[in-house]
Amino acid sequence: MNQFLPEGLYPQPEGYTREDLLLAMQQRKILQAAAIKCDERHNLHVALGCCKGIIPRAEAARGILGGETRDIAILSRVGRPICFTVMGFAPDGTALLSRRSAQEAALEQIFRENRPGDILPAVVTGLAPFGAFCDIGCGASGLLGLRNLCVSRLTHPGDLLRVGQRLPVLIQSLDPARRRVALTLQELLGTWEENAA
């Protein structure tokens, strides 16, 4: 099983050659590089080394065209590593990239090969009053609900977690039809007696 990792955890070379990009396109391989700019059309510009790389707005995040994902999900990636696939090259040599396809590939594998109870590596990407959003592969999100963080009562996930924190999470439920993954930490924390010791 080829496990997809959260963004920032993939090896990231100083730069890619055109041959690296062509091979990745043929093999549908996931690459990672830093997003260096978001232009006025909300296209992400990516530092590749050998050429310019652009992720068009429609390819910058799952759900952006349907309105399920807001533009802040694109803007917030600037200065950070992002995962992508190579879709092709423009006539001027600019590499056309897709973060959305990398996210879809990660989710497809999770829905196909994982079951509730499986453990995934994750990185906390956002905190809300109802829980924490976690990158569970190539920027694809799972929700770690407030009640599933620990056996104690918390008023906010920030009481226990911080954005950027790496942690193992357990899959609580999978909903392929709605493309949702619910996560939990409770089962990984041990019993009351173990936690009190």
Functional labels for PLM-detected ranges:
Residues 1-197:
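Single-stranded RNA-binding regions, centering on S1/OB-family and related RNA-binding modules
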